[in-house]
Amino acid sequence: MKTTKEWWDKVSKSEDEMVNWLRDQYHGEITAAKRIADSKTNYNISKLEEKLIDSITKDEYRHAKLVKQLLISRNIKPEILTKEERYWNKVLPNVLEENTFTYFCAVGHLAETMRLDRIQLLASDKRFKDIAEVFMSIYPDELFHARAFKEMSTDEDIEKAKKFHNIGMNAIGLLP
C-alpha cells in the first residue's frame, strides 16, 4: 500500500501508467455521473436533494468532458472501459445492502474526500501543466460534492461506510 504521493511518483514516471491512469479518470467520471444520476430513481429524495444530485451529476459530466479533451490532446482515444472496479466492487454491495439514500451519500462523501487529496496533488504538479489545469478546475466542484454528500448523509452512515471505504482503498493500493 502507498500514499497518494507515492502513487503519483510512480504513475508520473511511466508513459504507459500515465495513459492508463488518464483512461481510468475518464471512465471514472462517466461512471460516477451515471451512478449519481441513478440515485434519483433508486431512492425517495426531497426536491432539494434532487437539485443537489442534478448539480453533482452535471459537474461529473463536465469533468468527463475535460478529461476527454485532455486525452484527445495527448492523442489517446477516450473510451468507457470494461474493467474491474476494484474500489467500487468492495463498496457498492454494501450500498445495495443498506439501501438508503443517506448511506449512498455517506459513500459519496468518503469517495469524493478520497479524491480531494489526489486532485490537490495533481493540480500542484507543474511538470504536467495540462493535467494541473484540468484538476485545478475540477477541485472546487469535488470539494462541493464532498460537502453536499456529507450534508445529505448522517454521521452514523458515514461511520458505517468507513469500513467498506477502507477495504476499497486497500483494493486500489492506497493507505486508508
Where are these regions (language model features)?
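Non-heme di-metal
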Residues: M1-P176
